[in-house]
């Protein structure tokens, strides 16, 4: 499979050299290394050019949205579209460290399962690169029943839990590059729902990155209401009913084209409000 590494950057000077060095140290070197920069004013681009040399492809963010979630999602979708000539795209945050076999491992899973998306686990590190307690899967746990669940049950789980972290994921651009991401959804959350609806989602227990936890993260380990009971979540839904209704509408209109008959039923009914609130 032809492979692209896609890194989205913004003011990435403190960490980018280590991140790109870990990409270049892979057992399977990517065919393309694409960096999409969102208006950095520090030395991000100079560092990237020095580390990667002529192999680096630099893109500039096209979105002007002031909404953080919409902006992040748009950046990754723009980057994925730029990599659509490749069969696999390995997604990366600007401050994480890739384990040496990450590309080889995730490409193998994409191929073996004909998957749209593979989401791996990761260790946690601090700003200095030191390991800290926990892992991505401990922060965003996946129900143990996932592996044996029927497709409809997996769809319910994907609606209820955030099952994929973008910086630890690999995707197929031919399946996802043309998929519009509704406002209010992050790219990794929406793509994981599309892949689950199509029964093409792989949750990988292997730790493939060191995920950096810093105060400057755009999206961190905030689980929000993921573990809250239905009562608290329904209360939250009432307080933000307009946003919730928009998200439900996005699910009902955006996912059915990808859903199998086993998963489409989960995209309708009151359970959506309960799962998304």
Model-derived features: positions:
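Short, well-formed alpha-helical segments that are part of the catalytic scaffolds
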Residues: 12-25
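Glycine-rich, basic loop-to-helix element that forms the pyrophosphate-binding segment
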Residues: 63-84
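Conserved nucleotide-sugar donor-binding catalytic segment
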Residues: 145-224
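Short loop->beta transition adjacent to catalytic acidic/histidine clusters or analogous donor-positioning motifs
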Residues: 1-3, 24-35, 43, 55-57
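A conserved acidic beta->alpha catalytic loop
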Residues: 37-46, 63
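Short beta-strand-to-loop acidic/aromatic patch adjacent to the donor-nucleotide binding site
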Residues: 86-95
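Acidic helix N-cap motif at the loop->helix transition within catalytic regions
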Residues: 17, 42-50, 101
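Conserved donor NDP-sugar-binding/catalytic core segment of glycosyltransferases
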Residues: 97, 102-134
